[in-house]
């Protein structure tokens, strides 16, 4: 009997089961203990294979692939700390709804807690963050293949969002020629191998339910808050709100076109919040709101009803409003709750939004990060997509820009970490095949610098803008102690990225003005390669510009 051969047959059942649940992309890191899984994945023609030497980046690559494909994405890693490196991506997926299938190779039980190399306690190591966790036994023919496949099917068939951790122990030998060991065990699944459906099929979730009193509420004064959603949903939400005559406050990830732009500026004006107090109902579509003033207003508003519609389960309301948590696909929910044509009830807010945008435009000439945030829509590639980093850059774009309705925007706004942003952007590009503009800060780029290796493999032009303000300048917006701000919060690194781009053979530009930036973009969009554009700006100008605009708009 060949242990290595049966390990591979066991792994082949697992991998084939994944294909029945829509898994097409599979991300693989190097490792020996994961050999059965890796070889089974390599032999399965249903998969598109992605590789990376860094497991943390690999997890975020899978996250980006899942964001665009809307399908589960599998990850294969070896045992030990390689597994722990998947934690950040798993946490993010749990908060933003992407489906990740983590296949973690492990030592067999007799090698745990006895000093064996690269052997740690992997079952349960992700605590409550996976939606499902499976600790498989050591491969053995004593367990029927139908148990293995139905176990996988149950976890994936009931997975609506987040990650599944499947821990897979394998005993040595891991290498060797294939023989007939376990062939009859595998063949007991019969014509399942020729089929394309799961062995065990779970009943789907109930469809969205119509709120029977919607006809009553749609005649009231309402406000629509749009959070993270798809591009198609964003366009539908914008039309829905316009028909109702309700003001739409659109987040940077809403893709609604933000018909009332610069919301994070005008929400600081007492006239706006006073008018919003007249709202009888607030309908929030999508979660993960970005703007500070929006979150402050959302926490303080007290309408008669506050509805939150999102496909992700959970409360999603840190302000704990009285109202309804409606778990539904946004587009489906809109169809069940049609808008009735009514005149807009807000008068002051459209005027304030226009004045706020004019205040931003008046400052657009200076070469800085706030101005770049405002101008970002000018640089979007046609038929492309935008990936926005975290920290200061996403807040500036949210507050100062107006993105086109229906233009795809992606980000990691669940846990909002700066880890893995370049890797996620790589996954977003690979899954879509579209020209991509990604924008991050210098610390975010440093954090995930080795992901530049992933950006060597793109199928369409990708431009990575690194806004180098020399540190974590978001802390300039916070009341951090002035005496310790630089040492313990900003942490300036005094680095430039030209040599990093050269190390990975990526094109590089360092524009000094808007004309040079436009020339760099024109060059970058010509070829299906990655271009790094480093925009060096004065350290605190972006934060100061935002603060000045907030003060100005608050007194309009």
Swiss-Prot record:
The keyword Nucleotide-binding does not apply. The keyword Metal-binding applies. Its cofactor is Mg(2+); Mn(2+); thiamine diphosphate. GO terms for biological process: menaquinone biosynthetic process. It comes from the Bacteria. It catalyses: isochorismate + 2-oxoglutarate + H(+) = 5-enolpyruvoyl-6-hydroxy-2-succinyl-cyclohex-3-ene-1-carboxylate + CO2. Keywords: Magnesium, Manganese, Menaquinone biosynthesis, Metal-binding, Thiamine pyrophosphate, Transferase. InterPro entries: MenaQ_synth_MenD, MenD_middle, THDP-binding, Thiamin_PyroP_enz_TPP-bd_dom, TPP_enzyme_TPP-bd. Binds 1 thiamine pyrophosphate per subunit. It holds the Pfam family TPP_enzyme_C. Its EC number is 2.2.1.9. Pathway: Quinol/quinone metabolism; 1,4-dihydroxy-2-naphthoate biosynthesis; 1,4-dihydroxy-2-naphthoate from chorismate: step 2/7; Quinol/quinone metabolism; menaquinone biosynthesis. GO terms for molecular function: 2-succinyl-5-enolpyruvyl-6-hydroxy-3-cyclohexene-1-carboxylic-acid synthase activity; magnesium ion binding; manganese ion binding; thiamine pyrophosphate binding. Belongs to the TPP enzyme family. MenD subfamily. Homodimer. NCBIfam families: menD. Catalyzes the thiamine diphosphate-dependent decarboxylation of 2-oxoglutarate and the subsequent addition of the resulting succinic semialdehyde-thiamine pyrophosphate anion to isochorismate to yield 2-succinyl-5-enolpyruvyl-6-hydroxy-3-cyclohexene-1-carboxylate (SEPHCHC). This is 2-succinyl-5-enolpyruvyl-6-hydroxy-3-cyclohexene-1-carboxylate synthase. The lineage of its organism: Bacteria, Pseudomonadati, Pseudomonadota, Gammaproteobacteria, Enterobacterales. The gene is menD.
């Amino acid at each position: 009997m060949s242990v290595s051969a049966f390990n591979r047959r066991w792994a082949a059942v697992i991998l084939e089961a994944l294909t029945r649940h829509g898994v097409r992309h599979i991300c693989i890191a190097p490792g020996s203990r994961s050999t059965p899984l890796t070889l089974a994945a390599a032999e399965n023609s249903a998969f598109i294979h992605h590789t990376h030497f860094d497991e943390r980046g690999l997890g975020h690559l899978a996250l980006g692939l899942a964001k665009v494909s809307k399908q589960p994405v599998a990850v294969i890693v070896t045992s030990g700390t390689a597994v722990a490196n998947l934690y950040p991506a798993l946490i993010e997926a749990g908060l933003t709804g992407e489906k990740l299938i983590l296949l973690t190779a492990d030592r067999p039980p007799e090698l745990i807690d006895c000093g064996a190399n690269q052997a740690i306690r992997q079952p349960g190591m992700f605590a409550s963050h996976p939606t499902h966790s499976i600790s498989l036994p050591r491969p053995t023919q004593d367990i029927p293949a139908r148990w293995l496949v139905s176990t996988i099917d149950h976890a994936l068939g009931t997975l609506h969002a987040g990650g599944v951790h499947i821990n897979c122990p394998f005993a040595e030998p891991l290498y060797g020629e294939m023989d007939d060991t376990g062939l009859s065990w595998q063949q007991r699944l019969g014509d399942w191998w020729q089929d394309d459906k799961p062995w065990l099929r779970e009943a789907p979730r109930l469809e969205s339910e119509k709120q029977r009193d919607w006809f009553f509420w749609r005649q009231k004064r309402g406000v629509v808050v749009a959070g993270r959603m798809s591009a198609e949903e964003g366009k539908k939400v914008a039309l829905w709100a316009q028909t109702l005559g309700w003001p739409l406050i659109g987040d940077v990830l809403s893709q609604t076109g933000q018909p009332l732009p610069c919301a994070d500026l005008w929400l600081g004006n007492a006239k706006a919040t006073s008018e919003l107090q007249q709202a009888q109902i607030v309908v929030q579509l999508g979660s993960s709101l970005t703007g500070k003033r929006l979150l402050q207003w959302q926490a303080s508003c007290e309408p008669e009803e506050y509805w939150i519609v999102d496909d992700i389960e959970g409360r999603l309301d840190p302000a704990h409003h009285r109202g309804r948590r409606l778990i539904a696909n946004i587009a489906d929910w809109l169809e069940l709750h049609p808008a009735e044509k009514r005149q807009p009830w807000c008068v002051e807010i459209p005027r304030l939004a226009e004045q706020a945008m004019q205040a931003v435009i008046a400052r657009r000439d200076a070469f800085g990060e706030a101005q770049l945030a405002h101008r970002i829509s000018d640089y979007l590639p046609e038929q492309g997509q935008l990936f926005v980093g975290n920290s200061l850059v996403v807040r500036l774009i949210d507050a100062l820009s107006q993105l086109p309705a229906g233009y795809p925007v992606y980000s990691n706004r669940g846990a909002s970490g700066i880890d893995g942003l370049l890797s996620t952007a790589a996954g977003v590009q690979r899954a879509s095949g579209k020209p991509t503009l990604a924008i991050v800060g210098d610390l975010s780029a440093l954090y995930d610098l080795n992901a530049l290796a992933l950006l060597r493999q793109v199928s369409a032009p990708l431009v990575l803008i690194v806004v180098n303000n020399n540190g974590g300048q978001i802390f300039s917006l916070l009341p951090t102690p002035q005496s310790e701000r630089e040492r313990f919060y900003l942490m300036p690194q005094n680095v430039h990225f030209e040599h990093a781009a050269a190390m990975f053979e990526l094109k590089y530009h360092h524009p000094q003005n808007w004309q040079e930036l436009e020339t760099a973009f024109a060059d970058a969009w010509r070829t299906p390669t990655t271009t790094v554009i480093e925009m060096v700006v004065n350290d605190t100008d972006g934060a100061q510009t935002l603060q000045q605009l907030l003060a100005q708009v608050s007194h309009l």
